[in-house]
Protein backbone atom coordinates (compact mmCIF):
# COMPACT_ATOMS: atom_id res chain seq x y z
CA UNK A 1 0.00 0.00 0.00
CA UNK A 2 1.21 3.54 -0.64
CA UNK A 3 2.28 6.53 1.35
CA UNK A 4 0.18 9.63 0.71
CA UNK A 5 2.24 12.76 0.09
CA UNK A 6 1.91 16.03 -1.76
CA UNK A 7 2.25 15.52 -5.53
CA UNK A 8 4.89 18.29 -5.73
CA UNK A 9 7.12 17.09 -2.86
CA UNK A 10 10.63 16.62 -4.36
CA UNK A 11 11.11 13.32 -2.51
CA UNK A 12 8.25 11.85 -4.55
CA UNK A 13 10.41 11.56 -7.69
CA UNK A 14 13.22 9.91 -5.71
CA UNK A 15 10.84 7.33 -4.25
CA UNK A 16 9.15 6.58 -7.56
CA UNK A 17 12.54 5.84 -9.15
CA UNK A 18 13.06 3.26 -6.38
CA UNK A 19 9.62 1.71 -6.98
CA UNK A 20 8.26 2.92 -3.64
CA UNK A 21 4.47 3.14 -4.00
CA UNK A 22 3.42 6.76 -3.48
CA UNK A 23 -0.04 8.26 -3.93
CA UNK A 24 -1.19 11.85 -4.20
CA UNK A 25 -3.71 13.23 -1.74
CA UNK A 26 -6.12 13.76 -4.63
CA UNK A 27 -6.06 10.04 -5.49
CA UNK A 28 -6.27 8.94 -1.86
CA UNK A 29 -9.58 10.67 -1.17
CA UNK A 30 -11.24 8.48 -3.81
CA UNK A 31 -10.49 5.33 -1.77
CA UNK A 32 -12.65 4.12 1.12
CA UNK A 33 -9.68 3.32 3.39
CA UNK A 34 -8.72 4.84 6.73
CA UNK A 35 -5.05 5.60 6.16
CA UNK A 36 -2.78 5.81 9.19
CA UNK A 37 -1.91 9.42 10.06
CA UNK A 38 1.84 9.71 10.53
CA UNK A 39 3.57 12.97 11.49
CA UNK A 40 7.29 13.46 10.89
CA UNK A 41 8.89 16.19 13.00
CA UNK A 42 11.93 16.92 10.85
CA UNK A 43 14.63 18.59 12.95
CA UNK A 44 17.44 17.98 10.46
CA UNK A 45 18.91 20.86 8.42
CA UNK A 46 19.02 18.54 5.37
CA UNK A 47 15.25 18.36 5.27
CA UNK A 48 14.74 16.95 1.77
CA UNK A 49 17.34 14.21 2.26
CA UNK A 50 15.75 13.20 5.58
CA UNK A 51 12.28 13.21 4.01
CA UNK A 52 13.42 10.73 1.35
CA UNK A 53 15.18 8.49 3.88
CA UNK A 54 12.15 8.17 6.14
CA UNK A 55 9.51 8.00 3.41
CA UNK A 56 11.53 5.25 1.72
CA UNK A 57 11.26 3.09 4.84
CA UNK A 58 7.72 3.76 5.96
CA UNK A 59 6.53 3.41 2.36
CA UNK A 60 7.87 -0.14 2.19
CA UNK A 61 4.97 -1.72 4.12
CA UNK A 62 1.46 -2.98 3.22
CA UNK A 63 -0.10 -0.06 5.13
CA UNK A 64 -1.53 3.12 3.62
CA UNK A 65 -0.04 6.15 5.35
CA UNK A 66 -1.11 9.79 5.32
CA UNK A 67 2.13 11.66 6.04
CA UNK A 68 2.28 15.14 7.61
CA UNK A 69 5.65 16.95 7.70
CA UNK A 70 6.30 19.25 10.67
CA UNK A 71 8.99 21.83 11.42
CA UNK A 72 9.76 23.95 14.46
CA UNK A 73 8.10 27.34 14.49
CA UNK A 74 10.58 28.65 17.07
CA UNK A 75 13.64 27.88 14.92
CA UNK A 76 14.77 29.50 11.67
CA UNK A 77 15.86 26.83 9.18
CA UNK A 78 18.73 28.24 7.12
CA UNK A 79 19.54 25.21 4.98
CA UNK A 80 16.20 24.77 3.26
CA UNK A 81 14.25 27.10 0.99
CA UNK A 82 11.45 28.87 2.81
CA UNK A 83 9.02 28.05 0.02
CA UNK A 84 9.70 24.33 0.62
CA UNK A 85 8.64 24.72 4.25
CA UNK A 86 5.65 26.84 3.29
CA UNK A 87 4.50 24.36 0.64
CA UNK A 88 5.01 21.05 2.40
CA UNK A 89 5.35 21.60 6.16
CA UNK A 90 3.08 22.47 9.06
CA UNK A 91 3.89 23.67 12.58
CA UNK A 92 2.73 22.21 15.87
CA UNK A 93 0.16 24.98 16.17
CA UNK A 94 -1.39 23.78 12.92
CA UNK A 95 -1.97 20.23 14.19
CA UNK A 96 -2.17 20.42 17.99
CA UNK A 97 -5.95 19.83 17.96
CA UNK A 98 -5.55 16.64 15.90
CA UNK A 99 -4.59 13.10 16.86
CA UNK A 100 -2.06 10.92 15.06
CA UNK A 101 -1.45 7.20 14.80
CA UNK A 102 2.31 7.66 14.71
CA UNK A 103 4.94 10.36 15.17
CA UNK A 104 8.60 10.28 14.15
CA UNK A 105 10.99 12.76 15.81
CA UNK A 106 14.28 12.94 13.90
CA UNK A 107 17.77 13.67 15.06
CA UNK A 108 19.32 17.15 15.01
CA UNK A 109 22.91 18.50 14.95
CA UNK A 110 22.60 20.16 18.37
CA UNK A 111 23.85 17.41 20.65
CA UNK A 112 26.86 19.32 21.99
CA UNK A 113 24.42 21.82 23.55
CA UNK A 114 22.56 21.07 26.74
CA UNK A 115 18.91 20.32 26.01
CA UNK A 116 17.78 23.58 27.58
CA UNK A 117 20.19 25.56 25.37
CA UNK A 118 18.50 24.38 22.17
CA UNK A 119 16.44 27.31 20.89
CA UNK A 120 13.34 25.20 20.23
CA UNK A 121 13.50 23.09 23.42
CA UNK A 122 10.34 24.58 24.92
CA UNK A 123 8.36 23.94 21.74
CA UNK A 124 9.76 20.42 21.46
CA UNK A 125 8.73 19.79 25.06
CA UNK A 126 5.16 20.77 24.22
CA UNK A 127 5.18 18.36 21.29
CA UNK A 128 6.53 15.48 23.39
CA UNK A 129 3.95 16.19 26.09
CA UNK A 130 1.23 16.25 23.42
CA UNK A 131 2.47 12.90 22.09
CA UNK A 132 1.68 11.15 25.38
CA UNK A 133 -2.08 11.51 24.89
CA UNK A 134 -2.55 12.28 21.20
CA UNK A 135 -0.24 9.81 19.43
CA UNK A 136 -0.49 6.01 19.51
CA UNK A 137 3.29 5.51 19.25
CA UNK A 138 6.26 7.86 18.82
CA UNK A 139 9.57 6.82 17.28
CA UNK A 140 12.50 8.99 18.41
CA UNK A 141 15.75 8.89 16.39
CA UNK A 142 19.34 9.76 17.49
CA UNK A 143 19.26 13.20 19.20
CA UNK A 144 15.47 12.95 19.10
CA UNK A 145 15.84 9.74 21.14
CA UNK A 146 18.20 11.44 23.59
CA UNK A 147 15.75 14.33 23.92
CA UNK A 148 12.83 11.98 24.48
CA UNK A 149 14.66 9.92 27.09
CA UNK A 150 15.64 13.10 28.92
CA UNK A 151 12.24 14.79 28.72
CA UNK A 152 10.13 11.77 29.67
CA UNK A 153 12.49 9.96 32.07
CA UNK A 154 15.33 12.29 33.04
CA UNK A 155 17.96 10.09 31.33
CA UNK A 156 21.04 12.29 30.73
CA UNK A 157 23.43 12.34 27.79
CA UNK A 158 27.22 12.38 28.07
CA UNK A 159 29.89 13.80 25.73
CA UNK A 160 32.13 11.34 23.91
CA UNK A 161 35.88 11.80 23.62
CA UNK A 162 35.59 11.00 19.90
CA UNK A 163 32.63 11.01 17.54
CA UNK A 164 30.80 7.68 17.32
CA UNK A 165 30.93 7.37 13.56
CA UNK A 166 30.39 4.32 11.40
CA UNK A 167 28.42 1.10 11.14
CA UNK A 168 28.43 -1.07 14.24
CA UNK A 169 27.42 -4.56 15.27
CA UNK A 170 24.57 -4.83 17.79
CA UNK A 171 23.13 -7.65 19.87
CA UNK A 172 19.45 -8.25 20.56
CA UNK A 173 18.89 -8.09 24.33
CA UNK A 174 15.19 -9.02 24.41
CA UNK A 175 14.16 -11.90 22.18
CA UNK A 176 10.38 -11.73 22.58
CA UNK A 177 9.61 -8.09 21.80
CA UNK A 178 7.55 -7.34 18.70
CA UNK A 179 9.76 -4.45 17.62
CA UNK A 180 12.54 -6.99 17.00
CA UNK A 181 10.36 -9.60 15.30
CA UNK A 182 12.45 -11.25 12.58
CA UNK A 183 15.74 -9.65 13.70
CA UNK A 184 18.93 -11.67 13.65
CA UNK A 185 20.60 -12.01 17.03
CA UNK A 186 23.38 -9.78 15.70
CA UNK A 187 22.68 -6.91 13.28
CA UNK A 188 24.27 -3.68 12.04
CA UNK A 189 23.21 -0.04 12.28
CA UNK A 190 24.94 3.28 11.54
CA UNK A 191 25.75 5.80 14.27
CA UNK A 192 26.85 9.41 13.90
CA UNK A 193 26.95 11.33 17.18
CA UNK A 194 29.15 13.15 19.68
CA UNK A 195 27.20 12.14 22.80
CA UNK A 196 25.73 8.99 24.31
CA UNK A 197 23.17 7.71 26.76
CA UNK A 198 24.31 4.94 29.05
CA UNK A 199 22.85 1.53 29.61
CA UNK A 200 23.13 1.93 33.39
CA UNK A 201 20.87 5.01 33.33
CA UNK A 202 18.22 3.27 31.23
CA UNK A 203 18.23 0.26 33.53
CA UNK A 204 17.39 2.53 36.48
CA UNK A 205 14.05 3.45 34.88
CA UNK A 206 11.49 0.67 35.36
CA UNK A 207 9.29 1.98 32.53
CA UNK A 208 12.12 1.50 30.00
CA UNK A 209 13.33 -1.72 28.39
CA UNK A 210 16.71 -1.93 26.65
CA UNK A 211 16.28 -3.94 23.44
CA UNK A 212 19.62 -3.79 21.62
CA UNK A 213 23.10 -2.48 22.23
CA UNK A 214 26.63 -2.61 20.89
CA UNK A 215 29.90 -3.25 22.71
CA UNK A 216 31.45 -0.38 20.77
CA UNK A 217 28.54 1.99 20.05
CA UNK A 218 26.50 1.46 23.22
CA UNK A 219 22.72 1.74 23.45
CA UNK A 220 20.80 1.51 20.19
CA UNK A 221 17.15 0.54 20.86
CA UNK A 222 14.86 0.94 23.87
CA UNK A 223 11.11 1.18 24.40
CA UNK A 224 8.92 2.81 27.02
CA UNK A 225 5.25 2.66 27.96
CA UNK A 226 4.86 -0.77 26.29
CA UNK A 227 5.79 0.62 22.91
CA UNK A 228 4.04 3.97 22.98
CA UNK A 229 7.58 5.38 22.96
CA UNK A 230 10.40 3.88 20.88
CA UNK A 231 13.97 5.19 21.06
CA UNK A 232 16.57 4.48 18.34
CA UNK A 233 19.98 6.00 19.06
CA UNK A 234 21.39 4.90 15.70
CA UNK A 235 20.40 5.81 12.16
CA UNK A 236 18.78 2.77 10.55
CA UNK A 237 17.13 5.16 8.09
CA UNK A 238 20.43 6.33 6.58
CA UNK A 239 20.95 5.98 2.83
CA UNK A 240 24.00 4.20 1.42
CA UNK A 241 26.04 7.39 1.03
CA UNK A 242 24.90 9.45 4.05
CA UNK A 243 27.96 8.69 6.19
CA UNK A 244 30.18 9.33 3.16
CA UNK A 245 28.61 12.76 2.68
CA UNK A 246 29.04 13.58 6.38
CA UNK A 247 32.69 12.48 6.27
CA UNK A 248 33.47 14.54 3.16
CA UNK A 249 31.65 17.57 4.59
CA UNK A 250 33.69 17.43 7.81
CA UNK A 251 36.94 16.98 5.87
CA UNK A 252 36.12 20.04 3.75
CA UNK A 253 35.56 22.01 6.95
CA UNK A 254 39.03 21.04 8.14
CA UNK A 255 37.75 19.00 11.07
CA UNK A 256 39.83 16.21 12.58
CA UNK A 257 37.49 13.37 11.70
CA UNK A 258 38.23 9.65 11.44
CA UNK A 259 37.02 7.54 8.55
CA UNK A 260 33.63 6.02 9.50
CA UNK A 261 34.24 2.53 10.88
CA UNK A 262 33.13 -0.63 9.10
CA UNK A 263 31.68 1.39 6.23
CA UNK A 264 33.99 1.76 3.23
CA UNK A 265 35.34 -1.33 1.53
CA UNK A 266 38.79 -2.03 3.02
CA UNK A 267 38.14 1.05 5.24
CA UNK A 268 39.32 3.12 2.28
CA UNK A 269 37.25 6.31 1.73
CA UNK A 270 38.12 6.16 -1.98
CA UNK A 271 36.21 2.88 -2.28
CA UNK A 272 32.50 2.17 -2.27
CA UNK A 273 30.53 2.01 1.01
CA UNK A 274 29.22 -1.40 2.05
CA UNK A 275 25.57 -1.37 3.16
CA UNK A 276 25.08 -3.78 6.08
CA UNK A 277 21.98 -2.27 7.71
CA UNK A 278 19.30 -1.94 5.01
CA UNK A 279 17.27 -5.09 5.74
CA UNK A 280 17.15 -4.49 9.50
CA UNK A 281 16.35 -0.83 8.94
CA UNK A 282 13.33 -1.82 6.88
CA UNK A 283 12.35 -4.40 9.48
CA UNK A 284 12.62 -1.89 12.34
CA UNK A 285 10.27 0.59 10.70
CA UNK A 286 7.81 -2.01 9.42
CA UNK A 287 7.62 -3.65 12.87
CA UNK A 288 7.05 -0.28 14.52
CA UNK A 289 4.28 0.61 12.09
CA UNK A 290 2.61 -2.78 12.24
CA UNK A 291 2.85 -3.79 15.90
CA UNK A 292 2.93 -0.44 17.72
CA UNK A 293 0.90 1.79 15.40
CA UNK A 294 -1.50 -0.21 13.21
CA UNK A 295 -2.30 -2.96 15.72
CA UNK A 296 -2.77 -0.56 18.63
CA UNK A 297 -4.50 2.48 17.16
CA UNK A 298 -8.31 2.85 17.27
CA UNK A 299 -10.18 3.09 13.97
CA UNK A 300 -11.53 6.47 15.02
CA UNK A 301 -8.75 8.61 16.49
Swiss-Prot record:
One Pfam family from the record: HTS
Site (Important for acyl-CoA specificity): 111
Residues involved in substrate binding: 163, 192, 249
EC numbers for this chain: 2.3.1.31
GO molecular function terms listed in the Swiss-Prot or TrEMBL record: homoserine O-acetyltransferase activity; homoserine O-succinyltransferase activity
SUPFAM superfamilies: Class I glutamine amidotransferase-like
Residue numbers annotated as active site: 142 (acyl-thioester intermediate), 235 (proton acceptor), 237
Location relative to the cell: Cytoplasm
Record's keyword annotation contains Cell cycle: no
Keyword presence, Acyltransferase: yes
Chief place of localization: cytoplasm
S-S bonds: none
Reaction(s) the record says it catalyses: L-homoserine + acetyl-CoA = O-acetyl-L-homoserine + CoA
Pathway(s) this gene product operates in, as recorded in its UniProt entry: Amino-acid biosynthesis; L-methionine biosynthesis via de novo pathway; O-acetyl-L-homoserine from L-homoserine: step 1/1
Single biological process term from Gene Ontology: L-methionine biosynthetic process from homoserine via O-succinyl-L-homoserine and cystathionine
InterPro entries, sorted: Class_I_gatase-like, HST_MetA, MetA_family
Residues carrying the site annotation Important for substrate specificity: 192
GO cellular component: cytoplasm
Function description: Transfers an acetyl group from acetyl-CoA to L-homoserine, forming acetyl-L-homoserine.
HAMAP family documented for this protein: MetA_acyltransf
Listed name of the protein: Homoserine O-acetyltransferase
Organism: Bacillus mycoides (strain KBAB4)
Amino acid sequence: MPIIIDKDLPARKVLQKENIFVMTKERAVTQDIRALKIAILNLMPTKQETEAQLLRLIGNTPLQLDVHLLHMESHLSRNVAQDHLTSFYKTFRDIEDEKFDGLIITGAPVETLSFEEVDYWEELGRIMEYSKTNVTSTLHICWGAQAGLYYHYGVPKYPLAEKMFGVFEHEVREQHVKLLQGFDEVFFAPHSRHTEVRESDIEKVKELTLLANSEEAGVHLAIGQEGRQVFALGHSEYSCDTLKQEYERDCQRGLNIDVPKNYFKHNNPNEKPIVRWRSHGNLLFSNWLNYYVYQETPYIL
